[in-house]
């Protein structure tokens, strides 16, 4: 009924505009008298002056839109009357049906509700239920909702501006932070790589010598504990000393000699513990970056460009287990089972 009233309002407004433009009354346009008078005038002008219909309409001072409204108004009013009658009849039928079915009570089973009080009465449908049945329908509905067909220009501009503002507000800070993070990582890695290239490296054997000394010390230790060795020495009347010997210190005549001999014994020899690695510049004056071969895996790893050859050199070849065939595996299982069976029989015979 609301749609019919809307159409009636649009029809009245259109007919009123045509009446104001031509001078005819609304009743004459609705009855068709205005259309008949205009048709007679157009026919006479076209016959006398030899003009076409469109030229005749322009000659009498009408516009095509007003002529279309005046000529089509009687038919439109008749169709609207039929539509209004149909809508009125449908509304009456709906009213009768509402009155008839208002007293009818549809019972819902509540047996399961007592067992499960939190059970939902309606079926659960997810948000993308219709999009699963009809792919793309959600996007279409959102587009229709955001764009108004009557004012598509302002709504389109509003939607585009809101999307652009969301990009500026959400995406640009995230992309900026990611780019800053990547730039910082590249800068730190490049600085560390250049520091390692420019640093003077020295080959030091001190850790190796220290581990060798520990190995020699533990290899010379007796398997018997020192307390047991002292007990045996006291019982046998022997004198055993653990650690350093102080014979040269015991034979000193003065405290100064004891101090000098102790310092001489405890002082480590002044031995050079490493050799400097010589750095070579790029040949031919190219001023390119150079690095020793043993440093290449480290530098390439910092820049993230380790080749497969360097990976194989660093990690070693991949050792894959040999796959046994089905027959050999069954044979192995059979051999182990038979060995277990013989072992059981042998134990059984030994008990008997």
From Swiss-Prot:
Biased composition (Basic residues): 340-352
Stated consequence of mutating residue 348 to T: Partial loss of DNA-binding activity
Biased composition (Polar residues): 326-338
Outcome after substituting residue 63 to T: In strain: 776
Spans through the membrane: 290-310
InterPro entries per the UniProt record, alphabetical: Polyoma_coat_VP2 (IPR001070)
Protein keywords: Capsid protein, DNA-binding, Host endoplasmic reticulum, Host membrane, Host nucleus, Host-virus interaction, Ion channel, Ion transport, Late protein, Lipoprotein, Membrane, Myristate, Transmembrane, Transmembrane helix, Transport, Viral attachment to host cell, Viral ion channel, Viral penetration into host cytoplasm, Viral penetration into host nucleus, Viral penetration via permeabilization of host membrane, Viral release from host cell, Virion, Virus entry into host cell
Motif (Nuclear localization signal): 316-324
CC annotations in GO: host cell; host cell endoplasmic reticulum membrane; host cell nucleus; membrane; viral capsid
Keyword field contains DNA repair: no
Region spans: D1: 273-308
Highest taxon of the lineage: Viruses
Domain notes: The D1 region of isoform VP2 and isoform VP3 is necessary and sufficient to direct the interaction with VP1.
UniProt record similarity statement: Belongs to the polyomaviruses capsid protein VP2 family.
Name recorded for this polypeptide: Minor capsid protein VP2
């Amino acid at each position: 009924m609301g749609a019919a009233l809307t159409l009636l309002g649009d029809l009245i407004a259109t007919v009123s505009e045509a009446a104001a433009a031509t001078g005819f009354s609304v009743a004459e346009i609705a009855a068709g008298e205005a259309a008949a008078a205009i048709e007679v005038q157009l026919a006479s002008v076209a016959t006398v002056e030899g003009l076409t219909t469109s030229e005749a309409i322009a000659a009498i001072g009408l516009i095509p839109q007003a002529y279309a409204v005046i000529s089509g108004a009687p038919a439109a009013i008749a169709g609207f009357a039929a539509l209004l009658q149909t809508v009125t009849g449908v509304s009456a039928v709906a009213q009768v049906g509402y009155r008839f079915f208002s007293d009818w009570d549809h019972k819902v089973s509540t047996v399961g509700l007592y067992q499960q009080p939190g059970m939902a009465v309606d079926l659960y449908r997810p948000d993308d239920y219709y999009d699963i049945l009809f792919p793309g329908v959600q996007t279409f509905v959102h587009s229709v909702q955001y764009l108004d067909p009557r004012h598509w220009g302002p709504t389109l501009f509003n939607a585009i501006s809101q999307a652009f503002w969301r990009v500026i507000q959400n995406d640009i800070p995230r992309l900026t932070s990611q780019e800053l993070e990547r730039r910082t990582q590249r800068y730190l890695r490049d600085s560390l790589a250049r520091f390692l290239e420019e640093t003077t490296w020295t080959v030091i054997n001190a850790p190796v010598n220290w581990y060798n000394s520990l190995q020699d010390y533990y290899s010379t230790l007796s398997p018997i504990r020192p307390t047991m060795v002292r007990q045996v020495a006291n019982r046998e009347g022997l004198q055993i000393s653990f650690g350093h010997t102080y014979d040269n210190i015991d034979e000193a005549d003065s405290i100064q000699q004891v101090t000098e001999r102790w310092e001489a014994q405890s002082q480590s020899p002044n031995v050079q513990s490493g050799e400097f690695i010589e750095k070579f510049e790029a040949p031919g004056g190219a001023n390119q970056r150079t690095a020793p071969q043993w440093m290449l895996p480290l530098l390439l790893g910092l820049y993230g460009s380790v080749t497969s050859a360097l990976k194989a050199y660093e990690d070693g070849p991949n050792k894959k287990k040999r796959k046994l065939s089905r027959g050999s595996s069954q044979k192995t299982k059979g051999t182990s089972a038979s060995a277990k069976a013989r072992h059981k029989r042998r134990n059984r015979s030994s008990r008997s």
